[in-house]
Amino acid sequence: MEPNCVQFLENRTILVTGASGFLAKVLVERILRLQPNVKRLYLLVRASDKKSAEQRYDVALGINTFGAINVLNFAKKCVKPKLLLHVSTVYVCGERPGHIVEKHFAMGESLNGKNKVDINTERRLADQKSKQFKEQGCSEEETEQAMKDFGLKRARLYGWPNTYVFTKAMGEMLLGHYRETMPIVIIRPTIITSTFSDPFPGWIEGLKTVDSVIIFYGKGILKCFLVDQKTVCDIIPVDMVVNAMIAIAADHCHDSGSHTVYHVGSSNQNPVIYKQIYEMMSRYFMKSPLVGRNGMLIVPKVTRISTLARFRVYTNLRYKLPIQILGLLSVISLSQRDKFALHNRKFKMAMRLVKLYKPYVLFKGIFDDKNMETLRIKNEAKDMEKLFGTNPKCIDWEDYFMIRISLAS
């Protein structure tokens, strides 16, 4: 482990927000294992939230947008604050193709350039909508779905694909606009996956991102999937993200007034495409198939479709229409009800996966990581990178995925 980062952590007071989250848990474990002489760790824990693209708009604004400015205001009141390290996501950059540079947002900037984002107006509109649905006597479930739809509509108005990345982008804007002299670093990881090496290879909490697809594929639930197989799957192990966070903090803790963005991913340094991942999954489950409830071996077979239009036609004809017919039969025949419920549940589960991953499986962008690469070169010159890995070039994707598929299954 390189001495600079270990020394940086010694006698430090660190506040970690969202401390019950996957990334934060790995960060806290890493800090304590590296430097037991850290002065204080304050861990902010709150009730669980659904951190997803489907979050209702008012909740997402409260957490991702105004939560960020609340942290900044708190940091300003601290005695001699050294750095505010804000974790965002690369997907705040939207769905545009090509090389995407590490650039922070200007206040009010939109992705499509058609409308200026007024964050206070967005909060007012969200509050008005929520109040309107309550006054109309809508149920909690109806209100939640309506607020999700409203958030998606607002996001797309400005060029963002979903509520989550839109509200995260607005959070970045507020930090940049109101930071004054506060040193701020924004870290934008790509899709965070299980550990590469620390605390041991393949660790992950629950089923996240790629792991859920692996399980549904292995169980034979995933019959078709929307994916451009030539698209790069930009994933990064969680321990590499945490290593980057600590290395970046150590490098910037004395930079007064800095406002830097770091992309932390693999697409620019060591890309892996979806076709490769599919082939790895296929090879694994051919050798080690799962066993179904009936005791029969499951042989997964997935139809991969590269465009959304073709996918909709295929799924409507192949699955949705037969399920709807089965639903009609279940009304007049009790024996068909369980069969209908089973197939309908599987179909909805698969469609939810597709909806969740659509912005990523058709994504044509490559995230530039010039700032991260500069820091890596600096650490390599000090012979530190070997012990404190942040370089995705060292990942052998075949080995990485075989361990993950084995653990997930």
From Swiss-Prot:
Keywords: Lipid biosynthesis, Lipid metabolism. Gene3D superfamilies: NAD(P)-binding Rossmann-like Domain. The keyword Manganese does not apply. It comes from the Eukaryota. The lineage of its organism: Eukaryota, Viridiplantae, Streptophyta, Embryophyta, Tracheophyta. The gene is FAR7. GO terms for biological process: lipid metabolic process. GO terms for molecular function: alcohol-forming very long-chain fatty acyl-CoA reductase activity. It comes from Arabidopsis thaliana (Mouse-ear cress). The keyword Disulfide bond does not apply. This is Putative fatty acyl-CoA reductase 7. PANTHER family: FATTY ACYL-COA REDUCTASE 7-RELATED (PTHR11011:SF115), MALE STERILITY PROTEIN 2-RELATED (PTHR11011). Belongs to the fatty acyl-CoA reductase family. Pfam families: NAD_binding_4 (PF07993), Sterile (PF03015).
